[in-house]
Amino acid sequence: MDKKIRIGMVQFEGNLGDVHSNIVHARELIGSAAAQGADIVCLPELFATGYNLSLLAEKTVSLGCAHYEYIVAEMAAAAKDNRVYLIAPAGRKTEMEGILTNSALLFDQNGALTGYFDKSHLWALERLYYKEGNAYPVFDIRLQDRSTRIGIMICYDAGFPESCRSLALQGAEIVFCPAAWRIQDVDMWDLNLSQRALENLLFVVGVNRFGHEGDLELFGKSKICNPRGRVLRELPMDRESVDVFEIDLMDVERFRTEIPYLRDRKPHIYGELLK
């Protein structure tokens, strides 16, 4: 059975607060990934508005609310035009007026918004402008002759083992981690992604922003880790980049047979984890 899927990573360099130019640029890069044969394309955290919340301040909410429908429409068109699944992280308008979540939107190959994940562990200033999420949904990806189940965690979520484990227990084979990860914590980026992949025996795809937003340096180094935690592909730290890499999902079954972490769990003695 063919279980190979081509993953597109868009290591994006944007302009803080300039939603229109960021959308135009993102569509170009999505097209580049599709031209390289990507089945699923992932953008980094808050690609459309930018991330430096100390500079955006109250504009974080006004930009997100004012441009949400525009972002959704453009990303839906990008997915449909390029016939790819697309993970587009953005502030998501909730049913409450003026309230956003820091989210990742999932579009299918027809441009339909099929689901979203709301970041649950908010970092620093994020909690002033975003509402936290409270669920870890999984999503079924259906290609012509292949299918898989994916999950999403966003940036700081990756530091909490429970995030990725929740997705693995629901059958995820790939977990995407769009991020705006700062240069001071590059070591944690490397450790967290590989460890989440290994302990759950699945693929982790980390897609980080690149560039400077004021005093915030975002270093890229987007990567794909296999179910043993090994880095299969890593993008540079010194520039924007688009890359497509093929993974074989049969590796998930193979490694879960060889190293049965999930099978050998003992939930009945983990009660302290729920406190």
Walk through the language-model features, giving the residues of each:
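Short polar catalytic/cofactor-binding loops
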Residues: 11-16
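Short beta->alpha transition motifs characteristic of CBS
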Residues: 49, 56, 105, 117-123, ...
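A short C-terminal boundary segment appended to hydrolase-like catalytic domains
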Residues: 253-275
